[in-house]
Amino acid sequence: MKKLKCISFHEGLDIIEVESTFTRGLPNLSIVGLASTAIKESVERIKATLLSCDFAFPAKKITINLSPSGIPKKGSHFDLAIALLILLQNEELDDFFVVGELGLDGSIKSTNELFSLLLFLSAKIKKAKIVVPKSIAQKASMIPNLEVYGLENLNEAIEFFKEKNYENFRFSHNHPLFANPLQIENEIFLQNMDFKLDFKDIKGQEKAKRACMIAALGMHNILFEGSPGSGKSMCAKRLVYIMPPQSLSEILMQNAYMSLDSKDCEFTKIRAFRHPHHTSTRASIFGGGTKNARIGEVALANGGVLFFDEFPHFNKQIIESLREPLEDHKIHISRVNSKITYETKFSFIAAQNPCPCGNLFSKNLSCVCSENEIKKYKNHISAPVMDRIDLYVAMDEISKDDKTSISSKEMSEKILQAFIFSKKRGQKEFNGKLKDEDLSRFCVLEKDAKDTLDLAISRYNLSLRSLNKILKVSRSIADLEQSLNISKTHILEALSFRARN
């Protein structure tokens, strides 16, 4: 029995072993293992291709098994692997992944989803050896973790495996983005030094900037509330530029997700920033569709920022549906033809006016809203959703006397040092995404900090979720000061960012 490896995407990336057996019986080719219609159609396509290229089709009963058999497989990129298993019965097939659709003339073609699959593979397996269509080999060779071999047609594929002259078909091109990596605790990171949007452009708003530093380091969720023009959106749009550097696997996964949404995605060190409009549909934000599960904004924001401007103007159902991805850090999408789970680890940033007219906090303009209108406006955001917000910032109007202070470069440098500090204690997750069972290990309180927190629990009647949020924010504040334990000062600052009715 011969084997080659291929890849498919169901609930995530699946490594598929393509196996072949040849037995006595009526000449026939059958494919088993939950193969899609596109794969089953390849039977006739492969037969026609072999005959047109003057290859003799074996006079045996051939069974192709796609293992594991319990996972649905789809895509015409299985063609090449199946054809090679038929033609190379006596050859040793090394540990290669093989992907590519066959044309009737023997040419090896790419498919729409192939580059996305390669990105997911590179994020999952290091130094995978893969045979791809020559048309995408140059682009694929820029993906780290892959040894890429590009083949143009079936004859080249036969030569490749028979003669084993692998280097003749090797494509190697290092993307300039991956030069000068930063190594932290045996892991490779790539630091962004391009501050296209800079915090020094924002005058005043020191508390909002402090909240942005805390949120950027720990990937916490923020709600900015303030009058129009107070700088809420400006703060949100600048946050991705100061977040900790991405690891190589994070960049690959970000681009893999982006490639599901757009064919022309580019590698970047800057984390994802998604900014859906308040009129967006539920399907566009959370993913879905009619038959196939299309990726949505919450998954595309993975590893970066999801920004909801004019938060109360979003549909109530959309706001309530945020609870799952914010709490579980993943989203499940089920449709007729597919069921997919995406990671949703992002910093959620919401911005809203304090009232429908926006002037409640204004010192210069009068608010024209009634008490009931303000109450209705506020109640559009439910208590369970507010409970998932880590940092609340009330922003005053900008004054002409306000000065610019810290720049994005300075903020980024402080966050990097705090990030390295957190990595050295063996922490792999962002503070804001720590599991509750990890809090006792990483969030060690000094005695006066514990007393202060106990007092806050009784005074504010804190829920368990709120308590854990305060601990996580305090951990980020302590990291910015490179403090091993959480002190009373850190707890008090975290409490100062709590939203109160």
Q: Which sequence ranges carry the predicted segments?
A:
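Peripheral, non-AAA+ core regions of ATP-driven protein-machinery
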Residues: 1-223, 227-230, 484-488, 492, ...
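Basic, amphipathic alpha-helical bundle interface domains used for macromolecular binding and assembly
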Residues: 32-43, 58, 65-75, 315-501
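Conserved alpha-helical scaffold flanking the Walker A/P-loop in AAA+ ATPase domains
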Residues: 213, 267, 272, 280-306
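Walker A/P-loop
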Residues: 217, 222-265, 328
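Hydrophobic anchor at the beta1->P-loop junction of P-loop NTPases
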Residues: 224, 308, 351
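The Walker A (P-loop) glycine that initiates the GxxxxGKT/S ATP-binding motif of P-loop NTPases
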Residues: 226, 287, 310
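P-loop NTPase switch/communication element
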Residues: 242-287, 347-349, 355
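Walker B catalytic acidic pair
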Residues: 303, 309-310, 321
